[in-house]
Regions:
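Nucleotide-activated donor-binding/catalytic signature segment of Leloir-type glycosyltransferases, i.e.
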Residues: 1-25
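Short acidic alpha-helix that forms the nucleotide-activated donor recognition element
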Residues: 22-34, 51, 55, 69, ...
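Short hydrophobic beta-strand element within catalytic cores of glycosyltransferases
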Residues: 39, 53, 59-62
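Aromatic "clamp/platform" in nucleotide-sugar-dependent glycosyltransferases that forms part
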Residues: 41-43
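Conserved acidic donor-binding loop of glycosyltransferase catalytic domains
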Residues: 62-64, 70, 80-82
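Conserved acidic donor-binding segment of nucleotide-sugar-dependent glycosyltransferases
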Residues: 74, 78-86, 94-100
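A charged, aromatic-enriched C-terminal amphipathic alpha-helix characteristic of glycosyltransferases
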Residues: 99-133
Length: 134
């Protein structure tokens, strides 16, 4: 978070995006203004960014790895091979098209049905009850 912005400034590199971190207070505005949420992480198995994107009525695009890839594939959201630039571009283009077709609304409905606090809470209770010693 520190070296990349300094490197970019030192060599006057511009990657097309601001290298400053987005303040948490401003994040909802960025989310609302976007058509799709791009999850660029390469080496993680899961991400809270997917439910976040769904709850903001957005298409989520992420790597086809771990739980992220499974959830994105199961919900019809684009995935990509993180080491393949052409595949990333394809997934982003697919996300743009899906957003225009209203996929974000479908994602929101999915999140409300399957990712609500009430439902997840019940699942935790069931898990603890099934594994507790009696």
């Amino acid at each position: 978070y520190i070296l990349v912005p300094l490197f970019n400034r030192m060599f006057r590199l511009q990657a097309g995006a601001n290298d400053e971190l987005i303040d948490n207070c401003d994040l909802p505005y960025y989310m609302a203004a976007s058509d799709a949420i791009f999850i660029q992480r390469k080496d993680v198995l899961n991400s809270a960014n997917i439910p976040l994107a769904f709850l903001f009525h957005k298409v989520a695009v992420g790597p086809d790895t771990g739980n992220m890839g499974e959830l994105l594939n199961n919900t019809g959201n684009p995935t990509f091979c993180p080491d393949n630039k052409a595949d990333i571009i394809r997934a982003l283009e697919e996300a743009r098209q899906l957003a225009a077709w209203g996929k974000g609304e479908v994602n929101y409905e999915y999140a409300m049905e399957n990712m609500s606090i009430k439902k997840i809470g019940k699942m935790y209770v069931q898990l603890y009850e099934s594994t507790s010693l009696k």
